[in-house]
Regions:
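Bacterial N-terminal signal peptides that target proteins for export
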Residues: 1-11
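C-terminal motif of bacterial Sec signal peptides marking the signal peptidase cleavage site
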Residues: 19-21
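CBM-like, beta-strand-rich accessory domains located in the C-terminal region of large
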Residues: 24, 319-324, 419-623
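Low-complexity, Ser/Thr/Pro/Gly-enriched N-terminal "stalk/linker" regions
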Residues: 25-79
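Well-ordered alpha-helical scaffold segments within catalytic/enzyme domains
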Residues: 30-49, 90-106, 118-126, 136-154, ...
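Long, well-ordered core segments of solenoidal/helical folds
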Residues: 60-72, 110-127, 158-178, 211-231, ...
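Active-site lining segments of carbohydrate-active enzymes
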Residues: 73-80, 138-238, 246-249, 335-355
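Carbohydrate-active enzyme catalytic cores, enriched for enzymes
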Residues: 178, 201, 242-408, 467-474, ...
Length: 623
């Protein structure tokens, strides 16, 4: 792909165009990336003032002791990727460099130098999968910059040349730099890695460094626009953690290197995305894992940058729980948390003010809960959007639900990419007839949404969130899912509500076209399911119960379906089952599907349960 740098120089107005005429005298001396010379003292003071920061600091030091006993990372690919080795190199070098700056103990310096020299000797950093290059470049750039004055001249030369020849120069190869024009996590990660490299070697190669910094300022604007209008990240929880963390690593490095000259004019959607991410985790600690995402929640370093930038400690409510856990995160960016939390105390972190959060954009989502502080609170996530987004699944209209600390309605999430790629699956083809949609976990058949006439959702269909309300007693959101079923339905709308903080309603209002349609309603769960009547089923897990009750149609036959996949390449789904029902709707007819999810002890309010979606409260609050 031939790339037009002028395009990015023009588009960089909303961020910053750093003129190539900048010279190295305008940059701080080494260390200049994220933590300037002398800033260690303030960091030490903050760590000493809070036992959680102190525990995090000592966890990093303990990990460094383990790293010192390990051989350096080797160039060993998994499939087409070197990424796990690049990530481990970044973890090691970042941790060790941090440890040296905070303790001045030579063992950390020596081990970081060994790690960097080993990576510098690799034949390449696998530019055909450029994420690998980006993370390795960031690793060596942090070590080179933070340890610059202590490295021998020979080591400096070898590491600097590796950053340039194996990191920066390959980013101009048009066979590998397609990510410059992308609007997803690849852009954020790769531009961050290249910018770290440019900042590290600025004084010896100012022309190359300036060109890369200037290029990144325009290019990284593209994915940052995808957070508009209100912060919902199209790729979901896991890739928010990846793309956004590297995006703020980029911003943090630029802010420190250029000071007041750097004013990126961050868009509102990007800044609001921290609230989106915080709301994505339920009381159980499990995230809403739609799209390519694992099941568990995890510490998100970028949240600490947002909390500091917005002066809003409540953004760290979920992160606080991860830090308080017995086993701290081993995230490769963990030292950045201590840099970005400087001046904040764990005791200053309060719960968020709102119990509902709605995000529109390319992949809309609504998130609601009855409480932030009660571990037994009800939590619901409802997804609109489109299968066509990067890393998307056929999950428009799908939802997750938990109560009493149990995730009752779940999402299987992603399958390991290499397991599918090595089986020859055409995984990254997003067209309607792609083999991607034959993967069990990726299509609508296994998600908590509808299947019409046994067909896949329409890939280029889009389901907006059309209404929501934060009204106490009737938290709700509604999505128009017509477009993903447009071949078979004239209209389809799904609403989900939490009623009186006690139970959940899932309501679908449908209209068929000129043909009869068979509608399947599905709920995926890891609970034990017992059909207790035509319209009711009991779910049991961890000694707790939930009743699934269908109030419309008046009579259906609930059933269960196996989650054993049909293809050898599909991952197993042990301990899960699907429950639901099928109905036939005549041509040109309307139908209502109304399902209640009643945690143990909850009593239905029939006057609310029977209300149409048009009767549900709606507001336009800016959550």
């Amino acid at each position: 792909m031939r790339f037009n740098l002028l395009l990015f120089k023009v588009s960089a107005i909303l961020l910053l165009v750093i003129a190539v005429s900048c010279n190295q005298n305008e940059l701080p001396v080494h260390p200049r990336i994220m933590l300037l010379k002398g800033e260690e003292s303030a960091l030490k003071k903050n760590i000493a003032s809070d036992e959680i920061w102190d525990a995090t600091h000592h966890f990093i030091l303990d990990e460094c002791e383990k790293i010192c006993d390990l051989p350096p990372v080797k160039r060993e690919l998994i499939g087409k990727r070197l990424l796990d080795k690049s990530r481990e190199a970044l973890r090691r070098v970042f941790y060790l460099s941090y440890a040296w700056r905070m303790t001045s103990e030579d063992k950390y310096l020596d081990r970081a130098e060994m790690e960097m020299l080993a990576a510098a000797e690799f034949e390449d950093w696998n530019p055909s999968h450029f994420l690998d290059v980006a993370e390795m470049t960031m690793a060596l750039s942090i070590g080179y910059d933070w340890l610059y004055r202590e490295l021998s001249p020979e080591s400096r030369k070898l590491i600097r040349e590796a950053i340039i020849t194996k990191g920066l120069v390959p980013s101009f190869d048009t066979d590998n730099n397609w990510w410059l024009a992308a609007s997803h996590n690849w852009n954020q990660v790769c531009n961050a890695g290249m910018t770290f490299g440019a900042l590290a070697i600025y004084e010896t190669d100012p022309g190359l460094a300036s060109e890369i910094i200037d290029r990144a300022a325009g290019s990284i604007r593209l994915p940052m626009e995808d957070y508009l209008p209100d912060g919902a990240y199209p790729e979901g929880y896991s890739y928010w953690g990846y793309g956004t963390s590297f995006n703020v690593m980029y911003l943090s490095a630029m802010e420190k290197a250029f000071g007041k000259e750097y004013d990126p004019e961050l868009n509102e959607g990007f800044l609001k995305s921290a609230s989106y991410l915080e709301n994505m985790t339920g009381p159980s600690g499990i995230c809403f894992n739609y799209s390519d995402c694992g099941a568990g929640g995890s510490l998100q370093p970028a949240m600490f940058w947002f909390a500091q930038k917005l002066n809003d400690p409540s953004l760290l409510w979920s992160e606080r729980h991860y830090l308080l856990s017995d086993k701290p995160s081993n995230d490769r960016l963990l030292p950045a948390i201590l840099i970005w939390s400087n001046g904040m105390a764990i005791n200053d972190i309060t719960p968020p003010a709102y119990n509902i959060r709605v995000g529109q954009g390319k992949n809309p989502v609504a998130l609601m809960r009855t409480s932030w502080e009660n571990p037994d609170a009800i939590f619901v996530g409802l997804k609109g959007g489109s299968p066509s987004v990067n890393h998307g699944h056929m999950d428009a209209g799908s939802f997750v639900m938990e109560a009493n600390g149990v995730r009752w309605a779940m999402d299987l999430g992603m399958q390991n990419y290499n397991s599918l790629e090595t089986a020859g699956v055409d995984l990254w083809n997003m067209s309607q007839n792609s083999q991607r949609w034959e993967v069990f976990r990726y299509n609508n058949f296994v998600h908590n949404t509808l299947t019409v006439n046994g067909k896949l959702q329409v890939v280029d269909g889009y389901a907006p969130i059309t209404g929501f309300s934060g009204q106490h007693g009737m938290l709700n959101a509604i999505t128009d899912i017509t477009a993903v079923y447009r071949e078979d339905l004239k209209s389809a709308t799904r609403g989900i509500a939490i009623v009186d903080d006690r139970y959940v309603i899932v309501r679908d209002e449908l209209e068929t076209n000129e043909n009869e349609s068979v509608i399947r309603w599905n709920l995926l769960t890891s609970a034990d399911v017992t059909i207790t009547g035509n319209n009711t089923a009991e779910l049991v897990k961890e000694g707790k119960k939930l009743v699934m009750k269908v109030t419309e149609p008046a009579k259906v036959k609930l059933k269960t379906w196996s989650t054993v996949p049909q293809h050898d390449y599909d991952a197993p789904n042990h301990g899960t089952i699907m429950a639901g029902f099928e109905i036939s709707v005549p041509a040109g007819s309307k139908a209502v599907l109304n399902v209640l999810l009643l945690p143990e002890g909850a009593v239905e309010d029939a006057s609310v349960s029977s209300k149409s979606l048009a009767e549900w409260p709606k507001d336009s609050s800016d959550q």
